[in-house]
Amino acid sequence: MTRLCTMAVTGGVAAALVAHAAAQPLPALETVLGRAGAYVLGLQQQLAGIVAEEDYVQDVRASSVLGPTTRSGLPGVRHRELKSDLLLVRPVGADRWVQFRDVFEVDGRPVRDRNQRLMKLFVTPSSATANQAEQIANESSRYNIGNLLRTVNLPVLALAILEPRQQSRFVFKRIGKGGDAPVRSAAAAATTVWVIGYREVEGQTMIRTTNFRDMPARGRFWIEPDSGQVLASELIAQDLSLTGVITVGYEREPALNVMVPIQMKERYDLRRGPSPVTGEANYRSFRQFQVKVDEKIAPIVKE
């Protein structure tokens, strides 16, 4: 009888604690976005010292590769497998980080001119910072296939939306709680996670076509509200002729104790004609890297 009574009392205390916790107000959306912004700035600094190995598969339906040559200059390529090192760099004098894909194997063959390309990019960079950033983006997309020029297939791209200086360009709204993210991320399924939708509302959009037409971005983030950690992202860029969707999942890397992208999926649909271009990248072998700098090398700036 005593034991039953103790259990009953303990259960009553637990129920009271649960009720008290439930009564605590949820943080405001602005508070969570502020935490997410601070988290993204910190994550950029952490990822700047880390290299990941990327296994990247791209596929194009037959109707998508007829006509002009692909981005790589090879006509009619329908399937591509890339192995790359992925790292975050900061061009000299720039105020933003740029992700660089250093491809070392294409369809099972080593890249022959890899050293020369890196020499041109980092040892003898352009004197114009913006031009150097553009060179990095173009080099990172060098082996993409399909009749679609794109430099947006980089896993941390969507995180820029949450940077404090960028948030005013977007409208945000909480649209649900954790559930199945469209990409691999076990943490994003937790019920405590917020799903926050966003929509770009200002001109001169973050993503633009090669003809400088705006492509307003929209999508969702899976965010842990107390810490601001981003567990998954969805980025949709769209205009009258094209829709691109890029999803990324994040998990903590135990050896480095930092959240890292573990998977990226992408799909591009053209309004007229071609079937979709799709891709899936998985990330592994995360490791610290060291850069030797002399007076001739454009330094990777760390703050």
Provide a role label for each language-model segment.
Residues A8, A21-A22:
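Residue-level detector of alpha-helix boundaries and kinks
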Residues A23-R218, P225-L231, Q238-V245, R252-P261, ...:
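Structured extracytoplasmic
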Residues A16-V18:
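N-terminal signal peptide c-region/cleavage motif recognized by signal peptidases
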Residues M1-G12:
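Bacterial N-terminal signal peptides that target proteins for export
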